[in-house]
Amino acid sequence: MEQLKEGNSYFVDEQYDEALKCYDKACLELSNNAEAFFKRSQCHSKLSNLKEALSDINTSIKLDSNNSKYYLKKGQLCFELEEFDTALKTFEKGQSIDSENSSFKTWIRKSKAEIQSNPTTTTTTTPTPTPTPTPAPQPVTTTTNPTPIPTTSNTTTTTNNNNNNNNNNNNNNNNNNTTTDSTTTKLPIPSSGNKVRHEWYQTETHVVLTIFAKFVTASNSKINLTSKSVNISFPLANGSEFLFEMDLFDPIVDKDSTIHYYSTKVEIKMKKSRAIKWDTLEFTDKSGPVGLMDQISSSPAVPSPYASKKDWDKLPNEPEEKLEGDQALNKIFRDIFSKGSEDQQRAMMKSFTESGGTVLSTNWDEVGSKKVVGEPPKGLEFKQYEK
């Protein structure tokens, strides 16, 4: 389990090679853990190892056939491998398990569109060599009578019609391509580099997730929030698709959560269902939260660089330290001296010094005009110090 947690940390930091090493060890130790193979499948997908990713997600489905997110991941991998029929069946299976997840509806629509478009593309590519001049002259060369001439004209007209139809189809395809090109010019792009970066932080009442990508809008993106998960998808300018799917650490109030679109980022503000501290953004195998919100106030999510290990909130409850001997006596002197007037402070200094520390008076009228004589405690004799 430690290897799985360590791999998750590397994965969040986008250190996929290191994460894969940890996931390999986790899959060996936890051979019956479907989540371990799912994590490794995600890591393989990030490293473009699509076949390895598909193998791992199939293992996850064998170990846990009722988890809808495994079917969603498998369908996406099949779609990327252009296995659209398998992808469609997988998405439909996942939708039957979790009908509330709108991501399945989106991917089913995409898969059907690809399946419908593939036959047209294959028929337009294969018939192109058939309308060549070779079949048309055959009736002319085989027949010597002039009567077949109308038939040749018919054949030429049909071939011309076919050519016209093909040209129309090509024109339609070109028109479609131009429309898609016009839309892809404004597709989102990462704010920096080729990877879409994300960050998150929490307050007492909300968890804020930020996706750093430019030109993301409500029309070109799909963001689905449920009480237990967040699903984000939008196409990128390089032709790929950004996907962010995560089961949340603790349930949220999706109705009270908000999504804000900016020119360089998307901010998703999710309201917590209860005032607890989230250890991570993603759900873990640990049952129950770390603690109530009083723990968040005592240990902030972003600690100060000058933070002390002392728990200052508990200071009022700590018993005061009891002083003894000279420390207690000096404390009394300091308290009296700090609160006294200027004459009282002068009287204390004069009486204490002249009496050798045996007399302490705050009455300047009494000690100011005469020398203070030392008064030793009972049973002791006062003697002058001889140098």
Curated annotation (Swiss-Prot):
One of its GO terms (cellular component) is ubiquitin ligase complex. SMART domains: TPR. GO terms for molecular function: protein-folding chaperone binding. InterPro entries: CS_dom, HSP20-like_chaperone, SGS_dom, Sgt1-like, TPR-like_helical_dom_sf, TPR_rpt. May play a role in ubiquitination and subsequent proteasomal degradation of target proteins. Belongs to the SGT1 family. PANTHER family: PROTEIN SGT1 HOMOLOG. This is Protein SGT1 homolog. It comes from Dictyostelium discoideum (Social amoeba). The gene is sugt1.
